[in-house]
Regions:
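A recurrent flexible, glycine/aromatic-enriched loop bordering the glycosyltransferase active site
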Residues: 1-17, 84
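Exposed loop/turn and edge beta-strand positions of beta-sandwich/beta-sheet ligand-binding modules
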Residues: 11, 34, 56
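Short aromatic/basic micro-patch
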Residues: 15-16, 52, 59-61
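A generic structural signal for short hydrophobic patches within well-formed alpha-helices
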Residues: 21-23, 41, 58, 67
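Acidic donor-binding loop at a coil-to-helix junction in glycosyltransferase catalytic cores
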Residues: 33-42, 79
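C-terminal subregions of glycosyltransferases and related glycan-biosynthesis enzymes
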Residues: 46, 56-176
Length: 176
């Protein structure tokens, strides 16, 4: 939940992977700089199990001059905002619908939009519109736009959610 709605809550220092999981994750996209770790965590969530040790074994080393790639400065924030859409596209590969329903149980109850494999882009778009992050909201709206423009998909949305063009018009309010 936190990875999708907020920010990366996991670190990769000392990350251990089984070879078969590693081979599914790599290579990471060259064009993604700040969110490579987060993308990897999302992919691991989709294809395997995450085990987090309770004991802190490793400490991050931070430079005082804020020159490292993850330093909190304006260029890092800009880069992260620009990478958000590519990062969220990672969720479109999810095939564990039950897991998505567990992750977003509060939003599913609030919106009455349940996940189905055939409506995954729409579902994730609706979930992103529930985020506080405007870049995630824009991504969500764009995914819904792309999905809804197809007449067959519009029919599926009506059948599963009673979603109409009137509902579609209201979604822009979530980005305002």
């Amino acid at each position: 939940y936190y990875l999708f709605m907020r920010y990366n809550c996991l670190t990769s220092v000392g990350l251990s992977l089984k070879r078969d999981v590693f081979e599914k994750l790599y290579p990471l996209p060259n064009s993604m700089c700040n969110y490579q770790d987060m993308k990897m965590h999302i992919d691991i969530l989709n294809i395997g199990e995450i085990k987090i040790l309770e004991t802190q074994l490793i400490r991050y080393r931070r430079t005082r001059d804020k020159t490292n790639i993850s330093a909190h400065n304006s260029i890092t924030t800009t880069r992260e905002n620009l990478e958000t859409e590519m990062l969220l596209d990672t969720y479109l590969k999810f095939d564990n619908i039950f897991l998505l329903e567990q992750i977003f149980h509060k939003e599913v109850n609030k919106t009455n939009i349940k996940p189905y494999q055939e409506t995954l882009p729409f579902f994730l778009g609706i979930m992103a519109l529930e985020s506080d992050n405007i870049y995630k909201k824009y991504w969500g709206y764009h995914k819904i736009m792309e999905f809804y423009k197809n007449d067959a998909n519009a029919k599926i949305l009506y059948e599963k959610y009673n979603f109409t063009f009137k509902d579609y018009l209201q979604l822009a309010k979530k980005c305002d």
